[in-house]
Amino acid sequence: MLDIKRLRQDFEGIKEKLAHRGEDLSALDRFPQLEEKRRDLINEVEVKKAKRNEATKQIAELKRNKEDAEGPILETRRLGDEIKLLDEELREVEAELNLILLSIPNIPHESTPIGETEDDNVTIREIGTKPEFDFEPKQHWDVMEDLQIVDVERAGKVTGSRFVFYKGLGARLERALINFMMDLHSDEHGYAEVLPPYMVNRDSMTGTGQLPKFEEDAFKVADTNYFLVPTAEVPVTNMHREEILPETQLPIAYTAYSANFRSEAGSAGRDTRGLIRQHQFNKVELVRFVKPEESYEQLELLTGHAEEVLKRLGLPYQVLSMCTADLGFTAAKKYDIEVWMPAQGVYREISSCSNFEDFQARRAGIRFRRDANAKPEFVHTLNGSGLAVGRTVAAILENYQQADGSVVIPEVLRPYMGGKEKIEMPN
């Protein structure tokens, strides 16, 4: 959520910056009119309250003098009724203003590239050596089906499309990756491990920016106030909703594994095979709460932590600075990390690392105090995938596949796989 004071002071300047996102900002056009109406209503209420106070004093004076006070009494009742109606109208205007604020995206940071499409994203660095094959590499869905480490058909029977059963060494590889990522982030990168709920309430989804704008993308539990988590970012960030943190606790860093649930409402026909786009998928998340003056340094740190997973797995990747049109609703600056998929001949997103500045903290009421007498300030929140597990499985299957159909297990995962070095073709 944007700072309403800043919006009042620099409406045209903010609107110009938001226009670089290329989104529909028609709701924002009502802000000046509603803000003027809000001020007028507040002034009118104050005038009527002053008149009512004056009438109340008259009543007291008349009663002291044992004179007729019926006129002022009727006047206070009339003014009270009018104030009540104005207060109700003011609440409606403020609710509409709040809805506008909740629907406006974050202001892009000055370092975010200005662009109109994903083609305007800027490549920051490419890391690793792409594998060379003396055979035609297979797509990861063919690799895993040939190895019989997933069962898509039965998942379709049990649930539907965009679900998968991992089995055997496929299930173990998924679990190995989760444990490896969590160990790396908690033991070496200094994140505190949490295991969050898989359901959250509406306030939590609003706090991190999924609601109200993206409700159609979420899975809501019928006849309840609960949503299945689209990412562990939601429960973990909301751990500190409506809290004032002491400065000495910052930065706070959490890592969390969770299953994630997304409707993929706008993805019909895209990535219908394989592990890239599932309704349910596992992900390891990184979340940081930091002081405002440190947040961009902290974004580089967090992004490096996500990259380290790929480096240790030996997977080639690139880092992109996302342009204004491809930034996402809540981010002021975002890096996407994309892993090389040799059979597809493209890089595919495996992590997004974002600085939300105070956008989420303002929605969720997450503040800190620099000392006991200081006024509370909003923290800056950051998050990133560290990493999406299914997509990491897909990348390993494509990059480590062998001519005989087997897949070499990255060395760093072997302790988590009982020392096994390969996933062999079944007999």
UniProtKB/Swiss-Prot annotation:
Coiled coil: none annotated. It is found in: Cytoplasm. InterPro entries: aa-tRNA-synt_IIb, aa-tRNA-synth_II, aa-tRNA-synth_II/BPL/LPL, Ser-tRNA-ligase_type_1, Ser-tRNA-synth_1_N, SerRS_1_N_sf, SerRS_core, tRNA-bd_arm. Keywords: Aminoacyl-tRNA synthetase, ATP-binding, Cytoplasm, Ligase, Nucleotide-binding, Protein biosynthesis. ATP binds at R262, S263, E264, E349, I350, S351, S352. It comes from Exiguobacterium sp. (strain ATCC BAA-1283 / AT1b). This is Serine--tRNA ligase. SUPFAM superfamilies: Class II aaRS and biotin synthetases, tRNA-binding arm. Pathway: Aminoacyl-tRNA biosynthesis; selenocysteinyl-tRNA(Sec) biosynthesis; L-seryl-tRNA(Sec) from L-serine and tRNA(Sec): step 1/1. One of its GO terms (cellular component) is cytoplasm. Belongs to the class-II aminoacyl-tRNA synthetase family. Type-1 seryl-tRNA synthetase subfamily. Transmembrane segments: none annotated. Gene3D superfamilies: Bira Bifunctional Protein, Domain 2, Serine-tRNA synthetase, tRNA binding domain. One of its GO terms (biological process) is selenocysteine biosynthetic process. Catalyzes the attachment of serine to tRNA(Ser). Is also able to aminoacylate tRNA(Sec) with serine, to form the misacylated tRNA L-seryl-tRNA(Sec), which will be further converted into selenocysteinyl-tRNA(Sec). Its EC number is 6.1.1.11. GO terms for molecular function: ATP binding; catalytic activity, acting on a protein; serine-tRNA ligase activity; transferase activity. Homodimer. The tRNA molecule binds across the dimer. It catalyses: tRNA(Ser) + L-serine + ATP = L-seryl-tRNA(Ser) + AMP + diphosphate + H(+); tRNA(Sec) + L-serine + ATP = L-seryl-tRNA(Sec) + AMP + diphosphate + H(+). L-serine binds at T231, A232, E233, E285, S385. Consists of two distinct domains, a catalytic core and a N-terminal extension that is involved in tRNA binding. Pfam families: Seryl_tRNA_N, tRNA-synt_2b.
